[in-house]
Design a protein with these regions (language model features):
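Extended, folded cores of ATP/NTP-driven motor/assembly subunits in large transport
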Residues: 1-238
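Glycine-rich phosphate-binding loop of nucleotide-binding enzymes
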Residues: 248-256
Length: 256
């Protein structure tokens, strides 16, 4: 109910504040503006001053959405959804920063906890598959990749059983918007994604499911693109960082 939701929101805000991040609870109209931005930025925020509270939901919803095989159009703006099909085996801190900062995109990360018993069972199966792949592979590169994956899974299995580690199913979608009337807008975004060793899927024929999964909601319809990531690796995503020095001639104080 509404009271439980309010208490949960206050508790979450309190936990975030402990990390040194300031929070603000949005009002109805501020929330409506935020949700409308999740579909497109081609609107005037000042419109909301004339909107009554009982018409906010209708104002947030797109007027017209047309889907094609590998793209869609929302209120006249061309867009396309990508899903991350594969992740790099080794990542650095803030590994999500470059992906979340691609211009003219919306990035949504869905996270769902996995039961510990099911997680251990899944990892056992994956280790067995990687051992078989390593033995049967005729290419050195594939065998090396399988060995690296197996070592990673062994380390994860150990941490799940002996430490306070958990497994989470993650779906990462990137929506590219053609705000600049660029015919190559999808290629530019795809290239930026691949720079970080992520493997994007064009979701050919799955743009409706991609649109649903990229909405600000707990719904994720791209089950085939869920990937299990351990909690400590996921915590290192840090999407809200700057990837460059802000001051001209600034002095670097250190790194971790």
């Amino acid at each position: 109910n509404e009271l439980d939701l309010e208490n949960t929101t206050i508790n979450v805000a309190s936990e975030i504040n402990k990390c040194g991040l300031n929070t603000k609870l949005l009002g109805r109209k501020e929330t409506a503006i935020f949700l409308k931005y999740s579909f497109s930025r081609n609107f005037d925020e000042r419109e909301i001053k004339e909107i009554e509270d009982n018409r906010l939901i209708a104002w947030v919803k797109p007027k017209k959405v047309e889907f094609r095989a590998n793209s869609y159009t929302v209120d006249g703006t061309q867009a396309a959804v990508f899903a991350i099909a594969d992740y790099p085996l080794r990542v650095r801190n803030a590994w999500g920063a470059d992906v979340f900062n691609i211009p003219n995109t919306k990035v949504v990360l869905h996270v769902k906890p996995v039961d510990k018993f099911k997680a251990i069972k899944r990892i056992d199966k994956c280790i067995g598959e990687m051992e078989t792949k390593q033995i049967l592979s005729e290419k050195a590169s594939e065998a090396n990749s399988a060995e690296t994956h197996r070592e990673t899974m062994n380390a994860l299995l150990d941490s799940l059983q002996t430490e306070n580690e958990s497994l989470l199913d993650v779906t990462l979608t990137i929506t590219a918007y053609n705000y600049l009337d660029d015919d190559n807008y999808k290629k530019a975004v795809r290239r930026s994604i691949m720079t970080g060793n992520f493997k994007p899927s064009n979701l050919y024929g799955l743009q409706i499911e991609g649109f649903k999964s990229s909405a600000i909601s707990p719904v994720s319809t791209l089950k085939n693109y869920e990937r299990g990531i351990n909690s400590s690796s996921l915590a290192a995503v840090f999407p809200f960082v700057r990837t460059f020095v802000m001051d001209d001639g600034g002095i670097m104080l250190g790194e971790n």
